């Protein structure tokens, strides 16, 4: 239901705005989803696979997005950076037809992302190679097509995962983002060919400057005209330009510029992310030959040396998560709902900023951030001349950086470009790193000057290096930032990676100070904000037997951990209190080094031998005081201000029963949290985040299961093996607990609960109907069923996501 509420007005706007243009849109520009009916084979590398006549016996039927690595078995000999999962060489083939009536149009294929080292062919003709797996790729198919007959699109993907070819985190493998067939006239707006800026913004007016790149693939020069129209969030016309003449030579692209004015603009911000739409029309004489839509927001953004980050002239402390792009059993092949769900959970938690670590995200991820009100650091690279990108840097960095800038420059959520992270060049005592950083920053400034540029510097970085970019990002160096601010008061500081619990001292990042780094960020106005490493657990960057990073505030199933209470308290005004119990015997995957946490859980179950032993209990709160009750007996009332990190420490002898914490402001109890001793598990509770899905073959429902005792208390101390299965018009993507030390593949349908929980991911098919999900618990006689429904798309359905139109 939340999805419908979030997007309904945008669907309505598409239906009612500019009807003449909507009708023409069907004739002049078409964007067809190309995700279905692909064939795939792994590790059968033969260049003949690119041809027309290939036996597809032994090839799998797959749909996009597709990540072949996520379903494979773990191997301790493989890199932990990739979650101990294999790569290899995969081939994809898709047979399709193009109608004879499309002859004379330009037909192109657009891939949002292929990881990695991809070669693309149509009808045996090689179209191109792209090594970097995070860029979009567009290829013109027109010269090679058979009209009214079969065509074959083939893609070879090579992800070898050798030492110098593997990223530091799980990237997945394959055509892991969407694909599109785009049909236009020979004269058309180039892909991502509009550039919208708002250089003047006041309460009375916003000046909107538009640069449009128009491509002419006809055989003669064209004299064209271009018109712009802006509509508001309700679909009403705000302003419209006249037609502006433009001459484009054959085989060339030319730009035209318009300046429009929005009276009394509604500004985009994190609380009210208001959006406008630019409609671009291209005419050849009186004939409309192309239309193009660009969603944008009116806002100003600036990082300053004294006030931090300013959004529309007002300071906004960035409460950020660093996020990679994987999601449990899906790997990196993420449908829209996967991203939407994660961002919904982040928003509720208090996050207002996302750092896309360490690559540009999918285009629809930024569409969601635009609409949900997140500010984003869009990051081009992890490393430059070291690591997996080193072999391609010299030949490809300009193309890859431009790819990000062109695609993402109109998103109001993007407030900062990042050109690199934890770079080897930062340690170089020479000026090589400084020159390289300046080279990349100059490229960004020339191509997209409306935003500032940063890089993320690590421990022991060269002082000169961090002074090159507009904004300097520090990873885990809050203490050094305080002294560097005194040395370099003109620098603009941002914590690009923030430890979740411990804090390093200046000159000793591993001092394990228990003053949470967020305290330094919050207390100093000049620091723009911080981005937690990491917001969530993720696959990769692991040591056997773990297959992922377990030190996030949310686990891989997006369940909030007890350790996340501090930032929830700091990032929200709503009163809250949370109980967490310290126990070093808990079976928790700690992670490593300074990213660890003390062993804590919201659990009150210990062996009988613990009776009477003193247990440490923590209550984290944003209230003035906390009263703690043990089995109904008050253990005291304590002031939050008397304890560090808004966390009050209590010590009390263990007795089975209940612990209740009450948060108090003034004389009022404003928040309550209770944990209790659980008995034996006697029933399974299954909760779907959405009971109705769209029958589009992509939509998802996340079904969480919990072991409960007879009183409904979560049983976290006695996990059980379970099996999930499915009937009807759905596909079981996987059944997974949040324990990253698993032995079965991420797409397995069997697992053991972890702290009483596990999760199934269900995907719709393209047929409406009922979906029945079954859970069988080891040792229990009766299964538990969950019923979902999948509804057909309306005949006139138009996607509400700009990247899907």
Predicted feature locations:
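Edge beta-strands of extracellular beta-sandwich domains
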Residues: 167, 291-296, 668-679, 782-792
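Short, hydrophobic beta-strand segments
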Residues: 141-143, 257-267, 648-654, 747-766
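Short flexible loop/turn segments that cap and initiate beta-strands
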Residues: 222-227, 270-277, 614-616, 622-624, ...
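Substrate-binding clefts and catalytic carboxylate motifs of secreted carbohydrate-active enzymes
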Residues: 30-50, 63-64, 68-70, 87, ...
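Short glycine/proline/serine/threonine-rich loop/turn segments at secondary-structure transition edges
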Residues: 102-105, 145-150, 164, 221, ...
